């Protein structure tokens, strides 16, 4: 069994990571830039762990959804993480709980040397594409936050009442409160693994005319859960990571109805909205979508540039050395 998350997301504040829980146990940190085989190594670790009967969590790259940024085996408290920018990670206690493997150790520098200027230029372009994406996402987020403030006044009572009703109906237990990214803004647009990961659980779909209303409801519900020391996993908004747009409490998942493949229960959040406010919100939504589309285009350009860098590094790699490192990492997992 596997669950899929993101290590972070491209947000209004730049890249925002959420993976501190992966470094609590035995942690393998991979170093090496583009084209060095980090993702392929993690896919192999994940495949072998699954074949051995372990449940795994895989963490995708928000700029390339097909690529792995981390793999975690919860029952072994064992993680392999891509420790390079923008999610730089270091070993807290080297060779005890943290193990660093640099996949570039045996690379042939002579094969890379002729392309140094090309690499520097490509890296500079890639950074600019991401900066442009974050600028557009910041503009989109300002619109979203302004809409949320406007809707808060109209929906505050309905949201508070619905959150209290949901809280009262849940089976609660005390424990850890954790956060994850289960959706992200990527080179493919908005990618969401929520429905894939929680099949078989009781699902509550929240229906509202505007997504801001659902976020207000989730915020109210999380406040009640936290005040009562209830265990939950909250899922960060891929655009505005200080806020949350879905939550799992025990065996119940609560999210926007459009994100769920099936719903066992539906909550409708409704309140009167004036024609003037509706007109303002619709115009703002169109502008918000324009900024998000521009951000996705920038992320896609950054990804294409990254592919170009990969093509330079990959032929210089010593893949026998990478395979040997993979075997050592598997020994750390299986205590051999």
Locations of regions flagged by a protein language model:
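N-terminal pre-Walker A segment at the start of P-loop NTPase domains
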Residues: 1-19, 157-196
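Conserved nucleotide-sensing/catalytic segment adjacent to the nucleotide-binding pocket
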Residues: 1-12, 47-111, 117-118, 223-297
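A cross-family "folded-core" feature that marks the main globular domain of proteins
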Residues: 30-31, 41, 57-60, 139, ...
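Glycine-rich phosphate-binding P-loop
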Residues: 27-46, 188, 199-225
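An accessory alpha-helical subdomain
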Residues: 118-171, 287-330
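Rhodanese-like catalytic fold shared by cysteine-dependent sulfurtransferases
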Residues: 67, 83, 164-177, 282, ...
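SAM-dependent transferase fold signal centered on methyltransferase-like domains
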Residues: 195-196, 318, 334-336
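Generic N-terminal leader/targeting and pre-domain segments
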Residues: 1-53
